[in-house]
């Protein structure tokens, strides 16, 4: 099986449907924290595996869209190679849409697929205007010309097209280097009873195996 270590990261304004899209693509609810479910928004990063056409796989990280959790968004994007930018057709380009795109560009993420979500809520005319706005928004950025795909997590429209577009980009994206020193940016820390502090992240270089001694920096 062709298993990629390439990571896809969601981006976009709060309530534009990032978590719902990830759920439709993977079958996994990325919002696992009790507070996330109670408040209906993503606070920490959710992780899942995306099955791609042709038998491949890629990791997918759902990052927060709310401005209060922008530091979590940055942490989640450090290992991302492909962006899945979510723009709601009934709302258009919003402040966090712009902010997230700038952050992704600064972090060196060079590939992007735009999901024009919630198209089931708008009429054909508004849908086309939203598509044109999204394409125009990308002009003058590293993501100009990226595909803009209408999608609905409710009806299922566009889900397979999104999956195919991501598969094409992932297939062209080299995975992180397997040689050299093992490096893993710490993206989350949590405590587990009986284990203590547990660090989470995605390797960007090298390999590690059970029993290896790792150094945490800065010390």
What are these regions (language model features)?
Residues 1-63:
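Conserved G1/Walker A P-loop phosphate-binding module
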Residues 3-8, 104, 119, 155:
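Conserved structured catalytic cores and adjacent interaction surfaces
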Residues 15, 21, 40, 62, ...:
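Residue-level signature of catalytic and energy-coupling elements of molecular machines
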Residues 21-24, 96-103, 129-137, 161-169:
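Alpha-helical scaffold elements adjacent to nucleotide-binding pockets in ATP/GTP-utilizing enzyme cores
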Residues 26, 30, 34, 38, ...:
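Signal for well-folded cores of large energy- and translation-related assemblies
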Residues 57, 63-68, 77-129:
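Conserved Switch II/interswitch segment of TRAFAC-class P-loop GTPases
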Residues 136-219:
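Conserved catalytic-core segments of large NTP-driven translation/proteostasis enzymes
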């Amino acid at each position: 099986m062709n298993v990629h270590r390439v990571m896809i990261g969601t981006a976009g304004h709060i309530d534009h449907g990032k978590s719902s899209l990830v759920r439709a693509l993977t079958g996994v609810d990325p919002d696992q924290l009790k507070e996330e479910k109670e408040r209906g928004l993503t606070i920490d990063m959710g992780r899942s595996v995306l099955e791609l056409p042709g038998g491949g796989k890629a990791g997918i990280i759902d990052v927060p869209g709310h401005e209060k959790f922008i530091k979590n968004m940055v942490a989640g994007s450090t290992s991302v190679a492909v962006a899945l930018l979510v723009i709601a057709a009934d709302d258009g380009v919003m402040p966090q849409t712009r902010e997230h795109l700038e952050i992704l560009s600064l972090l060196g993420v060079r590939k992007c697929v735009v999901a024009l979500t919630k198209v089931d809520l708008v009429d054909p005319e508004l849908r086309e205007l939203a598509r044109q706005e999204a394409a125009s928004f990308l002009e003058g950025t590293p993501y100009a010309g990226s595909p803009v795909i209408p999608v609905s997590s409710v009806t299922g429209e566009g889900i397979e097209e999104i999956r195919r577009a991501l598969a094409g980009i992932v297939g062209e994206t080299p995975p992180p280097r397997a040689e050299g020193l093992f490096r893993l940016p710490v993206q989350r820390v949590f405590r587990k009873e009986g284990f203590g502090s547990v660090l989470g992240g995605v390797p960007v270089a090298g390999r590690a195996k059970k029993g290896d001694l790792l150094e945490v920096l800065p010390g």
